């Protein structure tokens, strides 16, 4: 994978450890994608409820960001929820 700020046209972003996702062919930090989103359709992992994740097919758990100004959460799959949610919260607070 490639780090945040780099192109993700051919190679995926480093996701789990760094908290980056591909948007408009560039890797961005997940909380930046969520903060700048105008609608939930701006990224396939944005959500406002667990049902949104299920409907989009991107998981079944919508994790909110600690920053209350970010109105969208991030979808995760329940089987990895404990590990991923912990990392999601840690990345959102420290970055």
Curated annotation (Swiss-Prot):
Instruction: Please report the propeptide residues according to the UniProt annotation.
Output: 31-95
**Cross-referenced PROSITE patterns:** CYCLOTIDE, CYCLOTIDE_BRACELET
InterPro entries per record: Albumin_I_a, Cyclotide, Cyclotide_bracelet_CS, Cyclotide_sf
Q: Does the keyword Disulfide bond apply?
A: yes
> What is known about the tissue distribution of this protein?
Expressed in flower, stem, shoot, root, leaf, seed, pod and nodule (at protein level).
A Pfam family it matches:
Albumin_I_a
GO process annotations (BP):
defense response to bacterium; killing of cells of another organism
Post-translational modification comment from the UniProt entry: Contains 3 disulfide bonds.
Provide this UniProt record's keywords sorted from A to Z: Antibiotic, Antimicrobial, Cytolysis, Disulfide bond, Hemolysis, Knottin, Plant defense
The record's domain comment reads: The presence of a 'disulfide through disulfide knot' structurally defines this protein as a knottin.
**Function as written in the Swiss-Prot or TrEMBL entry:** Probably participates in a plant defense mechanism. Active against Gram-negative bacteria E.coli ATCC 700926 (MIC=1.1 uM), K.pneumoniae ATTC 13883 (MIC=2.7 uM) and P.aeruginosa ATCC 39018 (MIC=4.7 uM). Has hemolytic and cytotoxic activity.
What name appears for this protein in its UniProt entry?
Answer: Cliotide T1
UniProt organism field: Clitoria ternatea (Butterfly pea)
């Amino acid at each position: 994978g490639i780090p945040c700020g780099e192109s993700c046209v051919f190679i995926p972003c480093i996701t789990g450890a760094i908290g980056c996702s591909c948007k408009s062919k560039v890797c961005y930090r997940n909380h930046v994608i969520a903060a700048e989103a105008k609608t939930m359709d701006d990224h396939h992992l944005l959500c406002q409820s667990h049902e949104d994740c299920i409907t989009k097919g991107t998981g079944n758990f919508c994790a909110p960001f600690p920053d209350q100004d970010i109105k969208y959460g991030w979808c995760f799959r329940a089987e990895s929820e404990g590990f991923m949610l912990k990392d999601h919260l840690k990345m959102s607070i420290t970055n």
